[in-house]
């Protein structure tokens, strides 16, 4: 059984502590893929949920003073339960508040994968970095940032951009699938965090090949969505992306994946 078949067979529970803007899209995307999202945010039920969950996604897009302690509590409970965590430090370089929170979170919680654009990942290892928001700086050296971040933070790193870079231990892989229309819909990167979590299967030390598959399945679905005859802009692309995630299979993944080890 390949990983995509396993995902659909097991229908893994993925707890999504994600931002308010993208909850609906993230949930629908994971359902289309074959996972079972739970948008649970209460620390009081975190022990029960993380015990059953395949993974926990934490996305700080709408971080507030009111929820920051809950995020850390839930992360610590997931650690106690042995549940892998995907961490998405959205716009961490945009404010000192976000930088300080991420520094604290990563100091108190062990994460399995950190996903972000080059600017966000750079900020995690160089807190003097500034950025205007969630946008990535295309001139940054994503390969070296990923390598340094993986070593410094001792976790798997996924950097998104025109090409995606995955770094784990001393191995680095560049992926070249995707669609420019992903940048025209809100929550595309946030959904990718959920897709990564769906592929973890309670594994806190996933292989880099598993991470490659998760990212590539999503990006290949985006390519196919862009190419659909009726897609003529962001709105039709968004709905078609859900359909392509639903239709994705292992043969298509293996035939279409564009990857190279660096």
Curated annotation (Swiss-Prot):
Gene3D superfamilies xrefs: 3.40.1190.20
Domain of life: Bacteria
Pfam families, per the entry: HK
Function: Catalyzes the phosphorylation of the hydroxyl group of 4-methyl-5-beta-hydroxyethylthiazole (THZ).
InterPro entries for this protein: Hyethyz_kinase, Ribokinase-like
Phylogenetic classification of the source organism: Bacteria, Bacillati, Bacillota, Bacilli, Bacillales
Organism: Staphylococcus epidermidis (strain ATCC 12228 / FDA PCI 1200)
One of the protein's GO biological processes: thiamine biosynthetic process
Name of the protein: Hydroxyethylthiazole kinase
Residues binding substrate: 39, 187
EC number(s) on file: 2.7.1.50
Single GO term (MF): ATP binding
Cofactor(s) essential for the protein: Mg(2+)
Family: Belongs to the Thz kinase family.
Gene: thiM
HAMAP family reported in the protein's UniProt record: Thz_kinase
Record-linked SUPFAM superfamilies: Ribokinase-like (SSF53613)
Keywords: ATP-binding, Kinase, Magnesium, Metal-binding, Nucleotide-binding, Thiamine biosynthesis, Transferase
Catalytic activity: 5-(2-hydroxyethyl)-4-methylthiazole + ATP = 4-methyl-5-(2-phosphooxyethyl)-thiazole + ADP + H(+)
Binding positions for ATP per the UniProt entry: 115, 160
Pathways involved: Cofactor biosynthesis; thiamine diphosphate biosynthesis; 4-methyl-5-(2-phosphoethyl)-thiazole from 5-(2-hydroxyethyl)-4-methylthiazole: step 1/1
NCBIfam families in the record: PRK09355.1, thiM
């Amino acid at each position: 059984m390949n990983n995509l078949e396993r995902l659909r067979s097991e229908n893994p529970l993925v707890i999504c502590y994600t931002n308010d803007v993208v909850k609906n899209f993230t949930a629908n995307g994971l359902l289309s893929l074959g996972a079972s999202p739970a948008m649970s945010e209460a620390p009081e039920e975190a022990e029960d949920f993380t015990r059953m969950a395949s993974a926990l996604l934490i996305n700080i897009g709408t971080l507030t003073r009111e929820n920051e302690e809950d995020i850390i509590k839930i992360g610590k409970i997931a650690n106690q339960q042995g549940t892998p965590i995907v961490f998405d430090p959205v716009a961490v370089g945009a404010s000192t508040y976000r930088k300080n929170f991420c520094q604290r979170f990563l100091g108190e919680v062990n994460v399995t994968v950190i996903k972000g654009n080059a600017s966000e990942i750079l900020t995690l290892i160089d807190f003097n970095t500034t950025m205007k928001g969630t946008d990535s700086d295309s001139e940054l050296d994503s390969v070296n940032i990923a390598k340094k971040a993986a070593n410094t933070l001792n976790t798997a790193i996924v950097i998104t951009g025109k090409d995606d870079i995955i770094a784990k231990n001393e191995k680095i892989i560049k992926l070249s699938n995707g669609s420019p229309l992903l940048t025209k819909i809100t929550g595309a990167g946030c959904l990718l965090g959920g897709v990564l979590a769906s592929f973890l299967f309670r594994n806190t030390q996933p292989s880099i090949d598993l991470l490659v598959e998760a990212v590539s399945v999503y990006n290949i679905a985006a390519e196919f969505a862009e190419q659909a005859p009726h897609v003529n802009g962001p709105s039709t692309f968004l709905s078609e992306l859900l359909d392509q995630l639903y239709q994705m299979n292992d043969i298509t993944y293996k035939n279409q994946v564009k990857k190279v080890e660096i």
